[in-house]
Amino acid sequence: MHATTVKNKITQRDNYKEIMSVIVVVLLLTLTLIAIFSAIDQLGISEMGRIARDLTHFIINSLQD
């Protein structure tokens, strides 16, 4: 009976760690997206077009190599 209780506690701890790691990942992704959209908002439309054009050229050149 004691072994079952210990096993259940270990399982609960593993589940807790897994849930906490998922929460941390979601929070980090959310903060990253907020930072990206904030930077895009500050750059403006003309800067975004230039960045998109440069990025497109970089991707095309990388694929051709």
UniProtKB/Swiss-Prot annotation:
The chain crosses the membrane at residues 19-39. Residues 40-65 are periplasmic. It holds the Pfam family SafA. InterPro entries: SafA. Its main location: membrane. Keywords: Cell inner membrane, Cell membrane, Membrane, Signal-anchor, Stress response, Transmembrane, Transmembrane helix. It is a single-pass type II membrane protein. Induction: By acid stress, via the EvgS/EvgA system. Residues 1-18 are cytoplasmic. It is found in: Cell inner membrane. One of its GO terms (cellular component) is plasma membrane. Connects the signal transduction between the two-component systems EvgS/EvgA and PhoQ/PhoP, by directly interacting with PhoQ and thus activating the PhoQ/PhoP system, in response to acid stress conditions. Belongs to the SafA family. Interacts with PhoQ. This is Two-component-system connector protein SafA.
